[in-house]
Amino acid sequence: VGKIKDRHALTCRNCYEFSHKHQLGKPEKERLRIEDRLLEDVRTYISENLGKPPVFKPVVHNAKATDHEMVLCLSDTHYPEVVSPDETMGLTYDAEVCARRLERIRDVVVRYKDLREPAYPIRKLSVALLGDMLSGNIHEELEITNQFPVSEALVRLAQLLHTMASSFAEEFPAVELVFMPGNHPRLTKKPRHKAKWNNWDYVLGHFVSALSRETYTVQVPKDLVYVHEVCHRRLGLVHGDGVKSASFAGIPWYGMRSRREAIQSLLRHLGQPAIDYLLMGHFHQLLYWQGTDCDLIINGAVKGGDEYSIDTRHASTDPVQALLTFHPKYGVTDLSRINLKEVT
């Protein structure tokens, strides 16, 4: 029976096991033979390869680190909307909460920069403001319940964003803000495709630009899709309301995939370079969706849940914003979630 002779009684716990082992059938005998061969092969391999160098090469510490850039996705503050905790199972939001959350975002971004700079320098921060920064008056209930009228809200929010950008300018070698218009601050009840930039978010961007006094750069494009370059990568910026969904704050997967493929096809048709990333807000949920030639990044909302999401979907998502880190060769190397849930 092969090497069964080597399995003497000392390896058995009692006589019953010994006799049982020596009365095994053919399948069990074959299993024992295979086990013996396997053990012998393992012993042989270890004895022959003991002391050989490891498969991995030693870690190489580069003396010179590569410059990186950061992109803060900032969207859907809906300033100065008021969310009543009495109606939303404790959710709360207003202009003061928004200000504290913006301050928290500022602190976290600078903290991440300080933590990473011992490993690699951060040469620039881009802030992609992806729309719906102002609550606007397109819905009658918002016009009635907003904490301030839209004109006053615009002035107050511009001051907050200027303070944030000025703080960033003290920490980063270069800071650039890009303002994209959302759907809530539009000037008409019905959405329009012509002159979509005719929007309170557009005015907000120019207001902040006037306050900047060239301490940081501000872009306020009229483009329906604005292309912003970061570390030799092309980022397409939109608000996202053009992607139709069955209900607000749902994720229309098919529509998003179609939009991502369509923009690449359009750029090729126009003889322009393709984009590497498509960034949008609007859906109030943070999402990174990798694609073949273009990754889709959806930002969360500073506001979080409200009466509408609770009443229509019995749902609320945490207020989260995205901070991206880019490498010149590898593109996005990190996505950090800035969770603002505890800031009330």
Protein language model features and the residues they cover:
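Divalent metal-coordination and catalytic microenvironments
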Residues: D76, D132, L161, G182, ...
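Structural motif
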Residues: E69-V71, K124-S126, E176, R233-L235, ...
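Short helix-terminating capping/connector loops at secondary-structure junctions
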Residues: R116-K124, A169-V175, Q272-P273
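Extended active-site neighborhood of metal-dependent phosphoesterases/phosphodiesterases
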Residues: K52-A63, I144-L177, P181, P185-H232
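BZIP DNA-binding basic region
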Residues: V1-S19
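A short acidic (Asp/Glu
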Residues: V83-S84, G136-L142, F179, L187-H193, ...
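Conserved beta-sheet core of the metallophosphoesterase superfamily
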Residues: A169, K196-Y202, H206-L224, C231-G236, ...
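N-terminal active-site segment of His-dependent metallophosphoesterases
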Residues: H20-T163
